[in-house]
Amino acid sequence: MSKISPVTGHYVTIEVDGLEYKVFYLENGTGQPLVCQHTAGCHNHQWRGLLEDEEITSNYRVIAYDLPRHGKSDPPENTEWWKEEYKLTANHYVNFIVALCDALELENPLFMGSSFGGNAALQLALRHPERFAGVLAVEGADYSPGFYLDWWQHPHANAAQVCGSGTWDLMA
């Protein structure tokens, strides 16, 4: 028996810190908005199980977006981004999430982020407690020192495959 998924995909253009981003998101459900951010290096497919869960989507409008340069979301459109340093700052991502919620006209959304997204959830709670009904920091931390694996640079290791495989293992 075949079944068509009720999940739909859309693009929205938002402006963040003077840059325009074309952001892809999936959504399903009715009720209070639940905005979901994937882990770094992944995309909104991480939330597919949640997007198709009938019990969840009968109470929540689940929205899972792709960060810029991830999944189906593009780098900024109004700049020569390939010539610029790719900056990953808490300020930028907090501004990005708020701009996305504003563009989608979400009132009192819940925000859930995994790993890097969990870190963003904590920053949202700190900086915009009035804007969100609540945040869920899945594997989030208030401080992430970062890491570097020397063996990824070894000629016998394919870092792209290793990273992709590791990220896939984090998906819900």
Residue ranges and their predicted role:
Residues 113, 117, 121:
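Gly/Ala-rich beta-loop-alpha elbow adjacent to hydrolase catalytic centers
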Residues 33, 61, 107-110, 131-134:
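Structural signature of beta-strand start/N-cap positions in the alpha/beta core
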Residues 122, 126-127, 132-169:
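Flexible "cap/lid" loop of the alpha/beta hydrolase fold
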Residues 42, 69, 118, 142-143:
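Active-site micro-motifs of SAM-dependent methyltransferase domains
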Residues 2-22:
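N-terminal cap/lid segment of alpha/beta-hydrolase-fold proteins
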Residues 21-79:
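Conserved HGGG/HGGXW glycine-rich cap/lid loop of the alpha/beta-hydrolase fold
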Residues 17-19, 64-112:
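Active-site loop/oxyanion-hole signature of alpha/beta-hydrolase fold enzymes
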